[in-house]
């Protein structure tokens, strides 16, 4: 209040306007003042007309003369001692520990996505994303983000998608490796992807079964389940691949020709999972119920509906040890002793080998009438 009174006294009204030809509708209510006071104002930017946008008055500057005031030019933010550039992207607080137990920093996360970025984009590019962000590290507050709520880097692309309530929202997607690095700069650790690309959101091209074990089950049970799912798909005429998720489970997945819509893909995967559970009720369940999952593996088919996501190949997981979701061959899977054995530091060796997921992605398959008929016959048997 004291500041406002001070300001009112300082702004002595003129009797006549300082400009000619002032419109009456303006002049009637205007109070004219001399331009000899200097105010400090916080604001976001100048508009194209030179007007301050989102201005906030901070106080008068009695130490400055009005004749000394000039328009400020934007200045680059000074680089901090712990900042660095990765893949052309400025990474702030690069030394901040993101995985404290593993000693991995924010800069390490960015460098991981620089290394695996080209391969990731080949597999997940142009798909709507859900980012799992941990700005203060995995021990701090973490959250999912799928919409562009403002402040996200330009390296991430946007696509407007109609949601279930009929409203449209801008979703994020990556088109190049620095998209992933830029998201890492914003604290993103995990990248989860849709089963369709932005140019045909109504036509899924990826089908995933996420094998999610109950707490009491051991890795050999999960590994055996992955092979059983693979064999059942093979019996239907479908070839599949495996991704160890960096958590407890395995994704058995295949690439689809874009000939079917979401309803068909969802119904196929639901029927498949329920048949597996019906034929092996002591080992599998096809519902999310925690009570029914006791001692069993949930064959999660729900990844195959519009808007659902699955962890992207080569994405980090926000878990102790900095594990990575890694595609493997069936021969490699047979020799693994866990689903989270790959770490950030193992990626150089992985990148020296051909990518198993690329072989799966290039083997486009279709849910033909013949495949669906085989599934129907199997379900009735």
Regions found by a protein language model. Name each.
Residues 1-8, 55-60, 220, 243, ...:
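Nucleic-acid 5′ end/cap handling module spanning
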Residues 12, 16, 22-111, 121, ...:
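C-terminal accessory nucleic-acid interaction domains of nucleic acid-metabolism proteins
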Residues 86, 246-248:
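Core structural elements
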Residues 251-257, 298-301:
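A short beta-strand motif that forms the metal-chelation/ATP-contact edge
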């Amino acid at each position: 209040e004291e500041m406002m009174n001070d300001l009112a006294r300082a702004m002595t009204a003129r009797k006549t306007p300082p400009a000619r030809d002032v419109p009456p509708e303006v002049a009637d209510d205007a109070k004219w003042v001399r331009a000899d006071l200097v105010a400090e104002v916080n604001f976001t930017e100048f508009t194209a007309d030179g007007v301050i946008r989102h201005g906030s008055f901070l106080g008068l500057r009695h130490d400055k003369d009005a004749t000394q005031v000039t328009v400020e030019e934007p200045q680059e933010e000074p680089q901090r001692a712990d900042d660095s550039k990765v893949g052309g992207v400025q990474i702030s607080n690069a030394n901040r520990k993101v995985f404290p137990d593993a000693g991995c920093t924010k800069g390490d996360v960015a460098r991981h996505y620089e290394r695996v970025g080209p391969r990731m984009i080949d597999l997940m590019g142009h798909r709507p994303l859900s980012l799992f962000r941990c700005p203060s590290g995995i021990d701090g507050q973490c959250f999912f983000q799928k919409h562009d709520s403002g402040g996200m880097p330009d390296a991430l692309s946007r696509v407007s998608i109609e949601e279930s309530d009929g409203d449209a929202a801008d979703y994020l997607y990556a088109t190049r490796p620095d998209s992933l690095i830029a998201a890492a700069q914003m604290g993103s650790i995990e990248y989860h992807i849709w089963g369709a690309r932005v140019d045909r959101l109504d036509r899924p091209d990826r089908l995933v079964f996420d094998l999610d074990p109950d707490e009491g089950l051991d890795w050999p049970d999960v590994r055996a389940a992955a092979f059983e799912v693979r064999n059942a798909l093979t019996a239907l005429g479908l070839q599949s691949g495996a991704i160890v998720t960096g958590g407890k489970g395995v994704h058995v997945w295949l690439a689809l020709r874009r000939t079917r819509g979401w309803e068909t893909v969802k119904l196929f995967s639901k029927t498949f999972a329920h048949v597996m559970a019906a034929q092996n009720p002591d080992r599998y369940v096809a519902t999310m119920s925690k009570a029914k999952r006791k001692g069993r593996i949930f064959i999660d088919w729900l990844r195959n509906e519009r808007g659902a996501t699955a962890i992207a190949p080569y994405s980090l997981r926000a878990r102790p040890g900095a594990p990575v979701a890694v595609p493997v061959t069936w021969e490699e899977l047979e020799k693994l002793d866990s689903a989270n054995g790959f770490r950030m530091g193992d990626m150089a060796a992985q990148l020296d080998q051909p990518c198993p997921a690329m072989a799966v992605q290039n083997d486009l398959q279709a849910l033909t009438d013949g495949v669906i008929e085989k599934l129907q016959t199997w379900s009735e048997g």
